[in-house]
UniProtKB/Swiss-Prot annotation:
PANTHER family: SAM-DOMAIN, SH3 AND NUCLEAR LOCALIZATION SIGNALS PROTEIN RELATED (PTHR12301), STERILE ALPHA MOTIF DOMAIN-CONTAINING PROTEIN 5 (PTHR12301:SF8). The keyword Membrane does not apply. The lineage of its organism: Eukaryota, Metazoa, Chordata, Craniata, Vertebrata. It is found in: Cytoplasm. Residues 1-65 form the SAM domain. This is Sterile alpha motif domain-containing protein 5. Transmembrane segments: none annotated. The keyword Cytoplasm applies. One of its GO terms (cellular component) is cytoplasm.
Length: 175
């Protein structure tokens, strides 16, 4: 059986019998599960009306929690640079040599994230937030790192930090 967050979520809904179908249909993360609708439940094989209602209600709660906690997450994609203060917005933009009329080249969905840069012979790649999250989680599991256990979750005493910072110039002179 699968042991992931979707299984735990379905277990909490008292519907663990659908876990394998969810994973087989690509719903292996809660971010993906937030997109579930009636056609998806048909494909997964959730036919009982009570089960469908329970899952759709849980999906609605996931979306609400995501909207409520939106300020708690980092944005992993680069932000577009702010518009420089200057000429009025009615000014005609100038083109650079080799640039099409539409402006700088865009990614496949019309956003600049699809662009890659090649400094020093290495190509930089941008990953979507969900894929990057999964890659990081898998790497932590492969390396045996548990962020919920010491030393990663150990509380740092503030008094010790403050004392160190107060004595820092003295300790650096002793070297």
């Amino acid at each position: 059986m699968c042991t992931n967050i979707v299984y735990e979520w379905l277990k909490a809904l008292q519907l663990p019998q659908y876990a394998e179908s969810f994973v087989d249909n690509g719903y292996d993360d809660l971010e993906v599960c937030k997109q579930i609708g009636d056609p998806d439940l048909d494909a997964i094989g959730v036919l009982a009306p009570a089960h469908r209602r329970r899952i759709l209600e849980a999906v609605r709660r996931l979306r609400e929690q995501d909207a409520a906690a939106a300020g708690l997450y980092f944005t992993l994609e680069p932000q577009p640079p702010p518009a420089p203060p200057g000429p009025s917005p009615l000014a005609v933009p100038t083109r650079r040599l080799g640039e099409s009329c539409g402006g700088p080249s865009q990614g496949p969905r019309g956003d600049p994230r699809g662009q890659t840069t090649a400094p020093r012979g290495r190509e930089l790649v941008s990953y979507p937030k969900l894929k990057l999250k999964i890659m990081i989680r898998d790497k932590l599991v492969r390396d045996g790192i548990h962020l919920s256990k010491p030393p990663y979750s150990r509380k740092v005493p503030m008094a010790g930090i403050l004392e160190f910072l107060m004595n820092w110039p003295k300790s650096s002179q002793n070297r």
